C-alpha cells in the first residue's frame, strides 16, 4: 500500500504541473523514457556512492533538449528522496492517471491479428458514442480468439470473437444436456 501511495504522490504532483504548463502528454513520454533508462542502468542509479547531481546530469545528457526544467526538478526530487526504485511504477501510474485527467478512457482491444486503421477508427467511434469520452486504445494479440475481438472499457466487456461465441454455444449445449 505504501508503494502505491508514494507513486501516486509523485504522479499527482507531476500531473498538476503538467496540466498548468500544458505538457501532460510530454511528461508521460519523458517518464516512459526515464523508466527505460532507469531499468537499463539500475545499478548506476541505485548506487549510493554516486551523487544525486551526477545521476540527474546523466539523465539530462541522455535526454538532450527534450527535457525541460520542470521535469529536471521532478527527477531531482525523486533521486534526492531516494525514490528512484519507484520510477517504473510512477511511469505506469502516470499513464493511467493522465488518461483520466484528460477526460479520456482506456480501451483494451484483444484480437486474433493486428487491426487495420479503419477497424481501429470504427472501434474508437463506437466507444466514443457509448461513453462520450475520447478512447485511448491499447491493442493485444491473442490468436486463440480465432477471429473477431474482445473490447473492454468502463467496466464492460464486449466479446465478439469466434472463440467467445463457440464457448457460449458450448455452455448452452451443456446446460440443455443437464436440464
Swiss-Prot record:
Looking at the UniProt record for this protein, which Gene Ontology cellular component terms does it annotate, in alphabetical order?
Answer: plasma membrane; proton-transporting ATP synthase complex
Which cysteine pairs are covalently linked by disulfides here? none
Q: Which residues form a coiled coil?
A: none
Q: Where in the cell is it found?
A: Cell inner membrane
Give the membrane topology. Peripheral membrane protein
Q: What is its main location?
A: membrane
State which residue ranges cross the membrane.
none
Report the GO molecular function annotations: proton-transporting ATP synthase activity, rotational mechanism
Keywords, A to Z, come to: ATP synthesis, Cell inner membrane, Cell membrane, CF(1), Hydrogen ion transport, Ion transport, Membrane, Transport
The record's Pfam families line, in alphabetical order, gives: OSCP (PF00213)
Q: Which family does it belong to?
A: Belongs to the ATPase delta chain family.
Function as written in the Swiss-Prot or TrEMBL entry: F(1)F(0) ATP synthase produces ATP from ADP in the presence of a proton or sodium gradient. F-type ATPases consist of two structural domains, F(1) containing the extramembraneous catalytic core and F(0) containing the membrane proton channel, linked together by a central stalk and a peripheral stalk. During catalysis, ATP synthesis in the catalytic domain of F(1) is coupled via a rotary mechanism of the central stalk subunits to proton translocation. This protein is part of the stalk that links CF(0) to CF(1). It either transmits conformational changes from CF(0) to CF(1) or is implicated in proton conduction.
Subunit structure and binding partners: F-type ATPases have 2 components, F(1) - the catalytic core - and F(0) - the membrane proton channel. F(1) has five subunits: alpha(3), beta(3), gamma(1), delta(1), epsilon(1). F(0) has three main subunits: a(1), b(2) and c(10-14). The alpha and beta chains form an alternating ring which encloses part of the gamma chain. F(1) is attached to F(0) by a central stalk formed by the gamma and epsilon chains, while a peripheral stalk is formed by the delta and b chains.
Please report the name of this protein according to its UniProt entry: ATP synthase subunit delta
Amino acid at each position: 500500500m505504501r508503494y502505491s501511495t508514494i507513486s501516486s504522490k509523485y504522479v499527482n504532483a507531476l500531473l498538476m504541473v503538467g496540466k498548468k504548463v500544458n505538457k501532460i502528454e510530454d511528461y508521460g513520454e519523458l517518464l516512459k523514457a526515464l523508466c527505460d533508462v532507469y531499468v537499463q542502468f539500475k545499478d548506476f542509479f541505485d548506487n549510493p556512492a554516486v551523487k544525486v547531481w551526477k545521476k540527474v546530469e546523466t539523465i539530462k545528457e541522455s535526454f538532450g533538449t527534450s527535457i525541460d526544467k520542470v521535469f529536471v526538478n521532478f527527477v531531482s526530487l525523486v533521486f534526492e528522496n531516494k525514490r528512484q526504485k519507484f520510477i517504473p511504477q510512477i511511469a505506469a501510474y502516470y499513464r493511467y492517471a493522465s488518461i483520466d485527467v484528460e477526460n479520456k478512457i482506456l480501451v483494451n482491444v484483444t484480437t486474433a491479428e493486428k487491426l487495420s486503421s479503419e477497424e481501429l477508427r470504427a472501434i474508437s467511434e463506437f466507444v466514443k458514442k457509448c461513453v462520450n469520452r475520447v478512447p485511448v486504445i491499447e491493442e493485444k494479440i491473442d490468436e486463440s480468439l480465432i477471429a473477431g475481438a474482445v473490447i473492454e472499457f468502463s467496466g464492460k466487456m464486449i466479446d465478439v470473437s469466434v472463440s467467445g461465441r463457440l464457448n457460449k454455444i458450448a455452455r448452452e449445449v451443456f446446460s440443455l444436456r443437464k436440464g
